[in-house]
Amino acid sequence: MPFSSYIGNSRRSSTGGGTGGWGQSLLPTALSKSKLAINRKPRKRTLVVNFIFANFFVIALTVSLLFFLLTLFHFGVPGPISSRFLTSRSNRIVKPRKNINRRPLNDSNSGAVVDITTKDLYDRIEFLDTDGGPWKQGWRVTYKDDEWEKEKLKIFVVPHSHNDPGWKLTVEEYYQRQSRHILDTIVETLSKDSRRKFIWEEMSYLERWWRDASPNKQEALTKLVKDGQLEIVGGGWVMNDEANSHYFAIIEQIAEGNMWLNDTIGVIPKNSWAIDPFGYSSTMAYLLRRMGFENMLIQRTHYELKKDLAQHKNLEYIWRQSWDAMETTDIFVHMMPFYSYDIPHTCGPEPAICCQFDFARMRGFKYELCPWGKHPVETTLENVQERALKLLDQYRKKSTLYRTNTLLIPLGDDFRYISIDEAEAQFRNYQMLFDHINSNPSLNAEAKFGTLEDYFRTVREEADRVNYSRPGEVGSGQVVGFPSLSGDFFTYADRQQDYWSGYYVSRPFFKAVDRVLEHTLRGAEIMMSFLLGYCHRIQCEKFPTSFTYKLTAARRNLALFQHHDGVTGTAKDYVVQDYGTRMHTSLQDLQIFMSKAIEVLLGIRHEKEKSDQSPSFFEAEQMRSKYDARPVHKPIAAREGNSHTVILFNPSEQTREEVVTVVVNRAEISVLDSNWTCVPSQISPEVQHDDTKLFTGRHRLYWKASIPALGLRTYFIANGNVECEKATPSKLKYASEFDPFPCPPPYSCSKLDNDVTEIRNEHQTLVFDVKNGSLRKIVHRNGSETVVGEEIGMYSSPESGAYLFKPDGEAQPIVQPDGHVVTSEGLLVQEVFSYPKTKWEKSPLSQKTRLYTGGNTLQDQVVEIEYHVELLGNDFDDRELIVRYKTDVDNKKVFYSDLNGFQMSRRETYDKIPLQGNYYPMPSLAFIQGSNGQRFSVHSRQSLGVASLKEGWLEIMLDRRLVRDDGRGLGQGVMDNRAMTVVFHLLAESNISQADPASNTNPRNPSLLSHLIGAHLNYPINTFIAKKPQDISVRVPQYGSFAPLAKPLPCDLHIVNFKVPRPSKYSQQLEEDKPRFALILNRRAWDSAYCHKGRQVNCTSMANEPVNFSDMFKDLAASKVKPTSLNLLQEDMEILGYDDQELPRDSSQPREGRVSISPMEIRAYKLELRPHK
């Protein structure tokens, strides 16, 4: 998205520049080969280095002779050496890794050793926003005239065009109006001159263009890529958001784009380009590293952090995961130094001058003129010297912010290079300027067009030759000469006190749909894998074949929404509708597929007809009528003498013992399992968000189900002559202004007479304030208490917008006494429903708080809260709704929030930055922890924003309704709110050891119990019900169950995905003898101080021993197991940075199929599955 230019006057400061040690040109041509220093180089002490160099030849000769004699003695004459690691990057130089001492795997105190942490930066920086002059957020940059005498400045100008897949237009509108013309222009203009270069990022547009392009255009683009003129950077389906996106979806969107690119053009990206996400997550750095990426470029980080890093020449660094004590996750990063990625803010520190070199702003083009008053002019023989020197001055000033004498200059903006004339204006003028600079040796500079690969390769080569390391710097063995850094870059501020924390919550309805599509897609992928694994080819290969294009469409619709104006909620209203419609269509398609797949997996349907064209016997129990409608439970009409079949699918790796629910129209019903054995059950009245009619007249039916890991289980809902007790009705109590209270039959109702009420199970008791329905505290089984202090509040925010959160003061409580409170106590579920009274006629929120009493289930450990939110109507304009838990945990205003559902990040509330700057993304989990080890966690199944503004507080924003645009290009507010439900799981835990959150700055992990609770919330059981009832007297068919795993996986091992990557090429791969399945695993790191609870809940094993693929599946034989990258394209583990001790043994060894995974790691494997003979 474009930015208006940021103009200002300010004061001066400066830094010196570095010099190198060689002068001749080392700028690579398009035909240059990569010299890639991927692995670690041992760091030596100076004396040792000097000794080695002085005696190098003697040492080398002696070592070589000894090695030769040892080899000859042990093995005889060696044969040819072959490598099992085959890769397209044959020119890579792999260097041996240094030895690093391992630390305890689940020690919460272990962490990375680095030079810089983002916490250190926040502690040090004063956030004064001082005026820096022409570079408003920096200082007046100067340099010495002789800085480049020993080594010339090498300048790479990188043309690019940022193409948002949806923002102010839909993705298809952008393609038709702009992106297809841009790609046509790139192909034509680059083909004219081999000196011209370009980079492209978004595969969603390239794939769309490819479908329309003629064979000649396709061939021309492929040639440009192969010749190095056009580089595909990132290569994901989109340039994803990094705050709200879950790591599952990030992996999916990058893999979808990378695999299409590799299949179509035959290249695999290795440089990431992320100029527009609004803040950066360290999870992204990890995922890219494990996909084989070597370098990253980022732009939108806090302007004060940029300034500090620039002052210390640390804008290029090695990003290391905070938990990585062994330095296996290192990736090289280039951070752009200025306000924006447009041309005025990329050539140097003075935008008024840089804008004069954006030749698309010359009169006659459609772009706005430079706002500083001086405009670009055509370069001629008469003005080339003056223009070149002015441009080179900016290049030199920018280069002083970095350590090396290799300089990157992006040249582009949103949807640029749309016409031949525009592209020619840029290429023509810049080439003339380059020619002048390059033909004058006295300037000590060489400039040319380049790609990211050209730049990063040259930087690495220079760093190999010139020692830029500083005394005492930890750095990295991967690329020497640069500092190491850990942490993330949230929350982003681009100027003054404008913090981009609003988009963590904008359009929360669609953030929730995003997660539903994720877990539904994952479930469908798992079912597809078992279908193709178990089925004989002739019998049922036809079944999934015609669905494969819908599966691909679902992957791509999920990927599209990960765009940094999609899941962020920062697009125009009708563009949001387009995203929502695409996701809704895919949800429907996936549910239909799953409903048919269960028939095959349970052996219900085996007709020879093409079964994917015939109607299914089942349908999803929850359905959405349209893209912006809440899911509605389809009620089961259990008439006398009938039974309804219910099929439950468990997407978890462990057996699920869980209380499940469906909605029924009648109360006189019973539940039976697949053997027609009676199952105890409970009914409760269904309540709704309506203070004039609290009860719908329908009932929630609960029973405890047991479903095998990744499996299916059948239950029956019966009404009639069965030898089972009817579902037990819950008992209701109320505090309400209704007189008389509308007690629904067949329930008994009594009045709440006290100021407090309680619900309880064997683990905890919840205490509520009857006057306002809020949760006061949790009383634990041992008598200890956790104060919760639940409070609903609102910010008044007239300056907030889709991106920015700018509140006018603190949030004020909105709940008043004397609302409706109804408690429901039953056999399996205890619930408190609260419809609070507020100053508005219709409350914007109601809630249900539940405890489960299933017995030995994960649910028993949590407090489940459903917030029904309706921030609808003008009464709520410029309001932002929050829930605040005012606990008694002495957290010192330190809290932890997750990054992309993958890892936790330590957060600290700073008084020196405004309230909005202390809000952070919460994709799925936040917790606070006290000095006595008491921990209070909130799990969410959608991304939101979280803060801890005062001692013991944990505050989460639920929704926001904003009238005004916040000046970041969208041109509107956020007024399209939808009714929605936000679900939290609260968990209060006691530690067996004490830890001060303020003094301990290392990363914290969730407990094992917390991990499992989060997984159950985000990967719920999928429920399907029969479309037609059956006669209760006919007890057939007995569908039974489907249990594909030989045994549940270890509790700390999570299946991220189990899929057939190329379902449309499934048969072809069989003929090519390639593994057709992919299994992605994550081993969870957990806080061992809390292990005692987690092991009590159906947790029989941990992944301390290697995982054995050969005995993982019950009736399937796994073979051809090969480790691969997370984008499923690389098979060289050294490229991916994995620790040597994790690498699998050669396939010729008897331990084939056994793999070890370290905590925190995500590993991907290709494998083949066939039924046992």
From Swiss-Prot:
The active site is at 276 (nucleophile). Glycosylated. Binds 1 zinc ion per subunit. Not sensitive to EDTA and not significantly stimulated by cations such as Ca(2+), Co(2+), Mn(2+), Ni(2+) or Zn(2+). Its main location: Golgi. It is found in: Golgi apparatus membrane. Residues 1-50 are cytoplasmic. The keyword RNA-binding does not apply. The chain crosses the membrane at residues 51-71. The keyword Transmembrane applies. Keywords: Disulfide bond, Glycoprotein, Glycosidase, Golgi apparatus, Hydrolase, Membrane, Metal-binding, Signal-anchor, Transmembrane, Transmembrane helix, Zinc. Zn(2+) binds at residues 162, 164, 276, 564. InterPro entries: Gal_mutarotase_sf_dom, Glyco_hydro/deAcase_b/a-brl, Glyco_hydro_38_C, Glyco_hydro_38_cen, Glyco_hydro_38_cen_sf, Glyco_hydro_38_N, Glyco_hydro_38_N_sf, Glyco_hydro_57/38_cen_sf. It holds the Pfam family Alpha-mann_mid. GO terms for biological process: hyperosmotic salinity response; mannose metabolic process; protein N-linked glycosylation. Its cofactor is Zn(2+). Glycans are attached at residues 106, 262, 467, 675, 772, 782, 991, 1098, 1108. It is a single-pass type II membrane protein. One of its GO terms (molecular function) is mannosyl-oligosaccharide 1,3-1,6-alpha-mannosidase activity. Inhibited by 1 mM Cu(2+) and by the class II alpha-mannosidase inhibitor swainsonine. It catalyses: N(4)-{beta-D-GlcNAc-(1->2)-alpha-D-Man-(1->3)-[alpha-D-Man-(1->3)-[alpha-D-Man-(1->6)]-alpha-D-Man-(1->6)]-beta-D-Man-(1->4)-beta-D-GlcNAc-(1->4)-beta-D-GlcNAc}-L-asparaginyl-[protein] + 2 H2O = 2 alpha-D-mannopyranose + an N(4)-{beta-D-GlcNAc-(1->2)-alpha-D-Man-(1->3)-[alpha-D-Man-(1->6)]-beta-D-Man-(1->4)-beta-D-GlcNAc-(1->4)-beta-D-GlcNAc}-L-asparaginyl-[protein]. Catalyzes the first committed step in the biosynthesis of complex N-glycans. It controls conversion of high mannose to complex N-glycans; the final hydrolytic step in the N-glycan maturation pathway. Converts GlcNAcMan(5)GlcNAc(2) (Man5Gn) into GlcNAcMan(3)GlcNAc(2) (MGn) by sequential removal of two alpha1,6- and alpha1,3-linked mannose residues from the alpha1,6-mannose branch of the substrate. To a lesser extent, also able to cleave beta1,2-xylosylated Man5Gn-glycopeptide (Man5GnX-GP) and pyridylaminated substrates Man5Gn-PA and Man5GnX-PA, but not active toward Man5-glycopeptide. Homodimer; disulfide-linked. Interacts with GALT1. Belongs to the glycosyl hydrolase 38 family. This is Alpha-mannosidase 2. It comes from Arabidopsis thaliana (Mouse-ear cress).
